[in-house]
Amino acid sequence: MICIILGLIINLGGWFGNDLIHAFTGFAFSGSRSEQSAGSAVRATDDAIGTFDKVEGNIDAGNVKFVYGDDYGFAYDNYPEKEIPKAEINGKTLKITQKVKNKNRIGDFKNGYNGAEIVITLPEDMAVDVDLHLSMGAVETKGITFGDMKLDADMGSIELDTVTVKDMDLTADMGAITVEDSVFSDGDIKAAMGGIELKNVKFDDADLEADMGGIKINGSFNELKARCSMGGIDVTADDDDAKMNLSADLGGITVNGQSVGRSYKN
């Protein structure tokens, strides 16, 4: 009976989280002025917003991604007119805010905000620090070099591909975290309802925790600490002398292809 209940929880959690995550699909945008499009959704780009070396944001709904360009830039796409994101330069920090006036309209997040997106453009020679909190939306970024990074997603996934980061702090309450072909120094990564996967990564030290979801890692690292409450841990380490401290409450642990039970420390 317990196994059946746990299975239902996991299946429902996975379905619910994926449904919400996939509610946010990216839309392309162009132009340097605000436009009115179907469904009272607004798109806009700001061509010259000044230089910055840090990005801070508090975003109620929508995806966020970073891209390289010739200059600094901020753009948004497919937001309701009354809830478009706001951006300002404060010192050397780009501050972004986006507020949903009535957060009880859960259905609107899927229907009215489908494709809502914020795009931040950086020059290739600039590695900015990032501190973003998203209530409902995903972060997807590929091929960017950052300074320190802190991402906190309440409902949505975090996907980083081919990025370089100094210190990485990632949290997803309902959504998966994936870091692929990337390099970082120290990492603190937590997922409450969703898995954590680090694919072909290189790092010095990382602390990973998943409450309801598995952890899978392959790459080169010096030290790794990982804990799972409900899920397994699978680690493939390129370095023979890599230090690991692993524990799984409800799930098995595999290290370099060998099953080691529910706890492992070397």
Predicted regions and their residues:
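Hydrophobic alpha-helical segments and their boundary regions
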Residues: I2-C3, T51, K202, S220
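Hydrophobic membrane-insertion alpha-helices, especially the h-region
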Residues: M1-L12
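Short, surface-exposed interaction patches in beta-rich subdomains
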Residues: K99, D161-V163, D167-A172, A176-N266
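Short linear S-[DN]-x-LW-Φ motif typified by the pepsin-like aspartic protease active-site region
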Residues: N11-V100, F109-H133, A138-K150, I158-D161, ...
